[in-house]
Amino acid sequence: MMKGRNKNAGHRLKDCHFSKEEQESLVKMFKELTKDNTGSIREDKLDRSQFREVLHSIFKMTDDVIMDRVLRAFVKDHEACINLYEWLTGLSVFLKGSLEEKIQFCFKVYDLNSDGFISREEMFHLLKTSMVKQPTEEDPEEGIKDLVEIIIKKMDLDHDGKLSFKDFSDSVNVEPLLLECFGTCLPEQKVIDSFMVMFAVPTP
């Protein structure tokens, strides 16, 4: 099924937000990234280390846990590599997604064990990796636990002690700033603008 999708990526995909020209440029970029040292395409997939380098060098992401989860949010199966179709549709949400698409994306990133919920343990783990420890803090873990409880109180709308997708979606729709409350998993707008300007079609 994926092979068919890869073939179709040469045409403009209907399920992404890029123009034909932008999509063609992203296809070229993907092919460049998947070349080996001899200049030939060794495989039509981006592996984990290649994708992490893209996230770090182009999109300025630094959190190891979040970067691995972003990879998982891009792929449609359980592989640790990204094919061309996933590259295009993933970047479509990553760079130009609607709020609803970004809510789905971020929830998938934060749901570390993919069970359909963000548990207290997952919240703690995500916040612990994303927060910078201050030298004056005696026990930063206690502060993180307190923050988890504040978030639970605010976002756990059905009061079951964890966040379902509905809890997360409803909370973010009311207060969009909660979208990345467990760590930055989308690039800043200025980074997106700098990236997209490379694909801008010159005006005559």
Locate the predicted segments by residue.
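EF-hand Ca2+-binding helix-loop-helix modules
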Residues: M1-V75, I82-Y110, R120, V148, ...
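EF-hand and EF-hand-like helix-loop-helix modules
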Residues: R12, Q50-F51, I66-A73, L84-L88, ...
